[in-house]
Regions:
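Phosphate-coordinating catalytic segments in nucleotide- and nucleic-acid-processing enzymes
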Residues: 1-136, 147, 230-268
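Extended, amphipathic alpha-helical scaffolds
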Residues: 129, 138-141, 168
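Hydrophobic core positions within the conserved protein kinase catalytic domain
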Residues: 140-143, 173
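A short, proline-enriched helix->beta-strand linker immediately N-terminal to the Walker B motif
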Residues: 143-150
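Walker B catalytic motif
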Residues: 154-157
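ABC ATPase nucleotide-binding domain "signature" loop
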Residues: 159-161
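C-terminal lobe/lid and adjacent interdomain/linker elements of RecA-like ASCE P-loop ATPase modules
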Residues: 168-268
Length: 268
């Protein structure tokens, strides 16, 4: 009986491993960038739930070109490109405002560096720049290096990113979907959602709407309820759920009302 149970357990384990093989998960707080990464021979090809193995995955890839979707900022369209993995990663990081991203390897040591800012090409270590860089780099590396049909699961990818970078990150996520990759994100960012909606409305081919699904989770007396947010190519979000990213609009309206009231009082 024990032997039969072991055989069944082994088969179940193989099935689970097969199912989960194409899934990659990055948690809500990625690891802070290190000044140097030391290869101790324990890297098993996975980026890690905190992106802690980004440097090793980055250097593991060969120079053989990969196909990926880039974004043309002038025409504001996605275009298919082919480039070595590290070049593709650098291109998308540049689009996100992380310029001159590069890495050096010295025996078992790895170091990431990038331009100090948009006005200088002076290189600085990745640990000497804003925390947001460490949050987005693992997402770009894993997203570009996984294959079509595989799935990337992200929790709060917007953490420590300013609004513009959040919107650019939404474009990157869309580029993965356009290339046949799947992305599941849990987000509180209206900037990411609004960028998705904008791209759907701008899309003349009608292909983006079928690639994007938005669900809103809310509490109720009976537990959590999942509402599907319907998107239209002509009207954007059709059925705004109650309290679905309406706080900013309400706050802006109250600011405008306060300004109007103050001006009216000053005229008295």
């Amino acid at each position: 009986m024990t032997r039969e149970i072991q055989e069944i357990t082994s088969k179940v384990e193989l099935i689970l491993l097969s199912v989960l093989k194409g899934f990659f998960y990055l948690g809500p707080i990625r690891e802070h960038s290190l000044r140097r990464y030391i290869d101790e021979g324990q890297f098993k090809g996975e980026i890690g739930v905190k992106g802690e193995n980004s440097a090793f995955l980055y250097h593991q890839e060969s120079d053989a070109p990969i196909e990926y979707m880039a974004f043309d900022p002038i025409k504001e369209v996605f275009v298919e490109k082919s480039a070595p993995p590290r070049e593709a990663i650098g291109n998308w990081l540049s689009e996100l405002g992380i310029l001159g991203f590069t890495s050096e390897k010295n025996e078992e040591l790895y170091r990431f560096s990038l331009n100090a800012n948009e006005f200088s090409e002076e290189k600085v270590n990745i640990s000497d720049v804003g925390f947001g860089v460490s949050q987005v780099v693992p997402i770009v590396i894993q997203g570009l290096l996984m294959r079509g049909g595989e799935t990337l699961i992200l929790e709060q990818p917007e953490i420590h990113l300013h609004p513009k970078m959040q919107m650019k990150l939404a474009d990157f996520i869309l580029s993965l979907a356009l290339h046949g990759k799947k992305v599941i994100i849990e987000t509180h960012s209206e900037h990411i959602i609004n960028r998705f909606v904008r791209r759907i409305v701008e899309d003349k081919s009608g292909s983006l709407n079928s690639l994007i699904g938005i669900n809103f989770i809310k509490n109720s007396a009976d537990g959590s309820i999942c509402e599907t947010v319907n998107l239209s190519e002509t009207n954007g979000i059709v059925n705004w759920p109650e309290e679905f990213f309406d706080q900013a609009a309400e706050e802006q309206q109250k600011i405008m009302n306060a300004i109007i009231n103050k001006k009216m009082e000053n005229k008295k």
